[in-house]
Structures are given as structure tokens and as C-alpha cells.
């Protein structure tokens, strides 16, 4: 798990740096490129969950990690031959996005198969480990301007290969449930959707996570690279600094939850953290120095740590064993499926009104979603038990 997120951390910096700084693409095309990384989730995340519910997740993760070494190596060859173009990055984004959509459900299902007690704490510890690994990748990618993209892409591939080696040392983790004979993967996907839609505990969490994808993730992956480039004249180092502050806040929040244990009012914690994130977004619309942006990103990251940990805990505890991988895939699909929509919209919105004014719109939209959840769902009263 750590290897995948270390690789992801490198990609978080390298990909937008190549699009926005190296190729100097306008905000709309930055948004479209970021969309290519997330769009496969819409089509494949639930399929990945259906596959993981029926298979040995250890074997799946080994295969996915090895396949994921190919796109960064191919991109390194293209850059080394001075053939980098916008279309190449779109193809890379689609390839890595496809593999991410398959890896995440298998990873989450594997956790529930190896942890028998204390799942809430295990989720927090796992999340913290992932975020620390991602932070290391972000720090390493901050040197892209100095050491070059080729070296970092090779390092990304090596990290993924080491992950496959680590997974190979785990015990087999076959499916623990019996599925209906003759049930196709499409039937399994539909069954997972019905299960989530019919659950009063799971449904509002997935709605909230979809809003996170559209209004928070989409804004984060498009507005920040454009702001760093246009407002501060920054490159990979400044983009890495901003991301480090965000993910640093997420790590602090997650480690605090590990220390404190399970939150009693998990749904309430989620909603308050999302409201705080909307306030941070609105504040980003105001001009200020780079250190001000980094502080805002740290605060935003603290809220993200609460939302990710408590949301995943609610879903993992509420989902039945027979449907858990598919339900967790829907949880991930919520924000990863919403992100391409948000990235595309925010890219063109930033091109129309500018990156700072554009930050106000998703903040206001998130407040409207929270009001809907407050009055039309039980999320505010929901407990992680």
C-alpha cells in the first residue's frame, strides 16, 4: 500500500507540473488532463470492486502493481527522446487512472480480510501509512525541476515494483463469501449499487464523497497548479510545498484520530470538516502571499483527514461481508468519479473568471450539499459503530 501511495505522491506533482509548467497549457487543458487521471474511475471502480469481491486480493494487487510500472517507464522514454506532448500525457493519465480504479477496491477489501478486530483503528493506521508514503513521494517529486522528470519516473516505476514484491510476501487473501451461481460481474455491480442505495448509513456518505470529488478534489488538482504558476511564478518546488502542507495536515488529522480512537459521532465530524473545507476554499479566493496559501492548504488537509478516515470507517462497518469490496469501491468512486467532473468544470471556470475567483463557486456548492444532508439524511447523527 505504501509503495502505491509513494508513487501516487510523485505523480501528484509530476503530472500537473508537466502539463502546467513544462507544456504551459491553459487552465481548461490542465483540467482536461487531470480529468484523464480520474475519468476511468467512473467506468471501472465498481467493476474493480466486483472483481475483488470474488478473487484473491493479494494476487490482484501483485498484478496491478507490476502493470503500473509500464506507464511511467513509457513516459520516461518519451521525455528522454524529446517527444513529450499534451496527447502523450492524456494517454498516460488514462492508463494510470485505469489501474488506480482497479487497485483501490482490491486494497480496501484486503484490509478487511486480514483485520478481524478494531477495524476503525486499522482504517486510521492504514490511512496514516498511506499518507506518509504519499508525502515522501511529494517531497521527492519537488526536485523535478532540478533532477528532471525522467529520473523521477524511473523511481516511480521502481517503487511500484517493490510494492509488488512486498505484496507477494503476504498470505493468500481469497474471497470469504459465497456468491450466487451464475451471477455475472455486471449483476454483481448492480447488486452493489442496490445495496448502497438501500442503506441509510452508506447512502449519505457516498453523496458527501461525490460532492468532495466535484467541489474539492476537482478544484484542488486544477486551481492550485494554475495559482502556483500564474499568481506566484512557481514551479515543481512551490507546487510540492503546497501539496506537502495539504497532505501534512491530513497526516496530522489521521494520526490524531489513531491516538484518540474511534469517534462516536463520525457523521457529524465529517460534516463539520466539510464545512471547514468550504471556508478554506472561499479564503483561497482572496489574494495573499504564498505562505498564506500553504497555511490554508494545511487547514484544508486537516479536514480532509477527518473526512477520509471517518467516511471510510462508517462504510466499512456498515457494509456486509458479501458486498464490502463493491461498497468500498462506490465510496472511492464517489470522490474519484466526481473529480473528473470537477476538474473539467474548474479548468474552464478558471479560464473564464481567473483561478482565485473560481474558488468561491465550489465552496458555495458544498455548503448547499451539506444543508441537504443535514435536513434530508441521518448523517449528522450517524455513529461509527
Regions found by a protein language model. Give the residues of each.
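Helix-loop junctions on the cytosolic side of multi-pass membrane transporters
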Residues: 109, 113-114, 153, 159-183, ...
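Juxtamembrane intracellular "pre-TM" segments in multi-pass secondary transporters
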Residues: 173-207
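Substrate-agnostic recognition of the 12-TM MFS/MFS-like secondary transporter fold
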Residues: 1-12, 37-50, 56-71, 88-145, ...
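The feature captures the transmembrane alpha-helix scaffold of multi-pass secondary transporters
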Residues: 31, 86-94, 206-207, 290-298
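C-terminal transmembrane bundle of multi-pass solute transporters/carriers
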Residues: 42-47, 54, 58-60, 64, ...
Amino acid at each position: 500500500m505504501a509503495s502505491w501511495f509513494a508513487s501516487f505522491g510523485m505523480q501528484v506533482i509530476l503530472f500537473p507540473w508537466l502539463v502546467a509548467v513544462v507544456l504551459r497549457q491553459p487552465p481548461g487543458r490542465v483540467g482536461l488532463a487531470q480529468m484523464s487521471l480520474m475519468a476511468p474511475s467512473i467506468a471501472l471502480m465498481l467493476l474493480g470492486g466486483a472483481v475483488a469481491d470474488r478473487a484473491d486480493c493479494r494476487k490482484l494487487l501483485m498484478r496491478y502493481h507490476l502493470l503500473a510500472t509500464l506507464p511511467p517507464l513509457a513516459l520516461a522514454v518519451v521525455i528522454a527522446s524529446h517527444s513529450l506532448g499534451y496527447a502523450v500525457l492524456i494517454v498516460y493519465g488514462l492508463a494510470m487512472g485505469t489501474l488506480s480504479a482497479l487497485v483501490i477496491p482490491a486494497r480496501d477489501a484486503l484490509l478487511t480480510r486480514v483485520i478481524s478486530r478494531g477495524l476503525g483503528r486499522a482504517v486510521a493506521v492504514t490511512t496514516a501509512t498511506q499518507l506518509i508514503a504519499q508525502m515522501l513521494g511529494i517531497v521527492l517529486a519537488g526536485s523535478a525541476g532540478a533532477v528532471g522528470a525522467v529520473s523521477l519516473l524511473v523511481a516511480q516505476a521502481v517503487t511500484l515494483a517493490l510494492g509488488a514484491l512486498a505484496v507477494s510476501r503476504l498470505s493468500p487473501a481469497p474471497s470469504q463469501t459465497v456468491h450466487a451461481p451464475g451471477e455475472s460481474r455486471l449483476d454483481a455491480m448492480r447488486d452493489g449499487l442496490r445495496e448502497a442505495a438501500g442503506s441509510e448509513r452508506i447512502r449519505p456518505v457516498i453523496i458527501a464523497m461525490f460532492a468532495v470529488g466535484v467541489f474539492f478534489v476537482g478544484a484542488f488538482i486544477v486551481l492550485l497548479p494554475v495559482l502556483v504558476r500564474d499568481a506566484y511564478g512557481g514551479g515543481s518546488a512551490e507546487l510540492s510545498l503546497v501539496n506537502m502542507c495539504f497532505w501534512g495536515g491530513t497526516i496530522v488529522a489521521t494520526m490524531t484520530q489513531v491516538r484518540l480512537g474511534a469517534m462516536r459521532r463520525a457523521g457529524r465530524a465529517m460534516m463539520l470538516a466539510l464545512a471547514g473545507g468550504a471556508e478554506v476554499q472561499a479564503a483561497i479566493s482572496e489574494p495573499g502571499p504564498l505562505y498564506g496559501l500553504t497555511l490554508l492548504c494545511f487547514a484544508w488537509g486537516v479536514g480532509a483527514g477527518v473526512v477520509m478516515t471517518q467516511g471510510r470507517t462508517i462504510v466499512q462497518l456498515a457494509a456486509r461481508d458479501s458486498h464490502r469490496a463493491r461498497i468500498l469501491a462506490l465510496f472511492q468512486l464517489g470522490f474519484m468519479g466526481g473529480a473528473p467532473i470537477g476538474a473539467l468544470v474548474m479548468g474552464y471556470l478558471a479560464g473564464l473568471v481567473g483561478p482565485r475567483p473560481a474558488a468561491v463557486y465550489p465552496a458555495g456548492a458544498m455548503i448547499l450539499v451539506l444543508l441537504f444532508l443535514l435536513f434530508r439524511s441521518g448523517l449528522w447523527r450517524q455513529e461509527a459503530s
